[in-house]
Amino acid sequence: MDAGERFQSSLTQVAETPLIPPSLSPAPRATSASHQPTPLLVERSMRRSWPQQKRLSLPQELPIRKFTQTGSWTYRSKHFRFTSNAPLRDHVVREFSSLFELTHLYCSQLPFDLERLHTGRKSDLEVRLIEDYSHYLREGGASGSGGIYLTEPDLILIPFEGLGLKKKYDSYALDLTRSNQTLMHEATHMMMRGPLLKDGWFVEGAAEYVATIPIRKNTLLIENHRESIKSYVVSYGYRDGGGHNLGREIELSSLQSLMECDYRGFQELENGYPYALLVFHYFAHSDGDGDGARLRDYAQALNKGADSSTARKKLLAGRDYRTLEKLLTNSWNQHGIALKFRN
């Protein structure tokens, strides 16, 4: 089995692969939580609601700046710096950089008061592209993965095959039939760096949520998002993008076990990633008035330094987990997914 086949087969197992390294252990998270947002930005975030746009678009022709030095090629888009150990054509860089810029654009619309956007971090976000897969593993990549975000030193590592790059003669071409959800997933982790990278269900639910938004020609098709999520969970996903194929009747562990476990515990949950995605979407679009207010308030509590237990009270809103399970079940049942919780 060659490298391309290895990666393709691993896509369906992406939920079982720890895509965030031990740098998300409690100590580094506590350190990043010490950076407190300014009162003005907190107030502004509290007023923001969930994005209502049906579509979000980038310019059709993204400007790319290129710099070269011996053995290294650097390409810069508006917010990202891509450093490659092999040369790439400009149109190829424009194609994959749009995935990162679309992720940045959407995450910037979320009402989560992202530390990334207001702590004076004006430098480009770092993405390192690695031609050889074994080199990717030596640099810290997870075996079988198509990319990984390292909280320290705050960069994304991606092997060429994770981008869908294939050698053609003396250069690389991009396989446009491939889903690149992994890239948006890791870019979402990068955007949410700080106090929000704490609870596994929220960390991975948010990343899966953003990564499942369909894309066409530099445009996020938000209007088709729920259908994309359904396909990703019950079948093989948009453009066969590594979906979980769980079927329309899904048995899950208790909601309490998902929401109260730490990040390492989350990694051990069966089907934790699609489970977290369904829960995240529910809180964003169906709970309460359907405006994501409780999810926003939960994130705001984390940003203010609250522990997970205290922040979760914003989501529970006086309800117990059994009540939330019924609400979650009823909500997804209306959209063709039958959930059954094990208690």
Residue ranges of each PLM-predicted region?
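Charged, low-complexity, helix/coiled-coil-prone segments
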Residues: A30-Q53, S123-L125, G146-D154, D170, ...
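Short low-complexity stretches enriched in small and charged residues
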Residues: R29-V42, H79-N85, G162-K166, T188, ...
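Acidic/His/Gly-enriched intrinsically disordered linker/tail segments
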Residues: T68, I148-L163, R178, L197-N343
